[in-house]
Curated annotation (Swiss-Prot):
Residues 25-36, 100-104, 166-172, 242-253 are extracellular. Pfam families: THH1_TOM1-3_dom. Belongs to the plant tobamovirus multiplication TOM1 protein family. Constituent of tobamovirus replication complex. Interacts with TOM2A and with the helicase domain of tobamovirus-encoded replication proteins. Disruption phenotype: Reduced efficiency of intracellular multiplication of tobamoviruses (e.g. crucifer strain TMV-Cg), characterized by a reduced accumulation of viral coat protein (CP) and reduced amplification of TMV-related RNAs. This is Tobamovirus multiplication protein 1. Necessary for the efficient intracellular multiplication of tobamoviruses, probably being a membrane anchor promoting the formation of the replication complex. The lineage of its organism: Eukaryota, Viridiplantae, Streptophyta, Embryophyta, Tracheophyta. It is found in: Vacuole membrane. The gene is TOM1.
Length: 291
């Protein structure tokens, strides 16, 4: 009886594992589930895109006298990134099966690069605030931001071009590792400047409601963005070596749902909610046009 009792947990675990595996395979192979999940992602991205557009319009109506500020560009890029993702998942059948394969890579990777550019814009903004508060030079920060983004896009274009001419598994592996490295750089940027600005605000001698709000804003956005980019880095790196975890394929709808909800949809929605406050109508030191 004792031996039987000891075997029961293992047997139950085995049965549960088999049932979950069977369900996972059934869902992945079901056209109905595939369509349902990808259309759900389409709807989620469309909703976030609409929220970003509404917020952009509200900001423009609030301060129409200013040009393209960092805040406006950030919301515009969120609108574009999430809108493009919504279209891609809305036409998932055509996108995942498009030929040549390099074109499929372009369609699926480009929104991820735009997501990187949009959110590292926050890193740039915080870096400028931190440097100004420390009386450090800020003239090279935007040059660095632009240079890093240009380098990332040029490298990615090179990978796409090579895949177009010589499609092989080695180049695909390099492409995935490159995306993982780019995601790690973004996570590091948030940890570095988000963390610095957070601790600088904590040491600020004057206690005020505005300081507490800004502290909560910086801390929350830093934690969210660092986590989502780090998860993207790990998942993409692992998927490069494990075909069972391959993303952006029709027969892995559940994996795609979990991945994109965790690394893009939920972080975007949370950040837009946290940064929902409209800028003041009068000129502020924290709200200035992009030069």
């Amino acid at each position: 009886m004792t031996d039987s009792g000891l075997m029961m947990p293992a047997e139950i675990a085995g049965i549960l594992t088999t049932a979950i595996t069977s369900w996972w395979d059934d869902v992945n192979e079901s056209t109905q589930w595939q369509d349902g999940i990808f259309f759900a992602l389409c709807g989620a991205y469309a909703l976030v895109s609409a929220v970003a557009l509404v917020q952009l319009i509200r900001i423009q109506m609030r301060v129409p006298e200013y040009g393209w500020t960092t805040q406006k560009v950030f919301h515009l890029m969120n609108f574009v990134v999430n809108g493009v993702r919504a279209v891609l998942f809305g036409f998932h059948m055509q996108v995942f099966l498009v030929h040549p394969k390099a074109l499929c890579w372009v369609l699926l990777d480009l929104p991820g690069l735009l997501f990187f550019s949009a959110y590292t814009l926050l890193v740039l903004f915080w870096a400028e605030i931190y440097h100004q508060a420390r009386s450090l030079p800020t003239d090279k920060l935007r040059i660095t931001y632009i240079s890093v983004n240009v380098a990332v896009y040029l490298a990615q274009i090179g990978i796409w071009a090579y895949i177009w001419v010589h499609d092989n598994s080695t180049v695909e592996l390099v492409g995935k590792i490159f995306i993982a490295v780019v995601s790690f750089i973004a996570a590091l940027g948030f940890l570095l400047y988000g963390g610095r600005l957070f601790f600088m605000l904590r040491r600020f001698p004057i206690e005020s409601k505005g300081r507490r709000k800004k502290l909560h804003e910086v801390g929350s956005v830093t934690a969210i963005c660092f986590t989502c980019f780090l998860i993207r880095c790990v998942v993409v790196a692992v998927s490069a070596f494990d075909k069972d975890l391959t993303l952006d394929v029709l027969d892995h709808p559940v994996l795609n749902l979990i991945y994109y909800m965790v690394v893009e949809v939920l972080p975007s929605a949370l950040v837009l909610f946290i940064l929902r406050k409209l800028p003041p109508k009068r000129v502020s030191a924290q709200y200035h046009p992009i030069q």
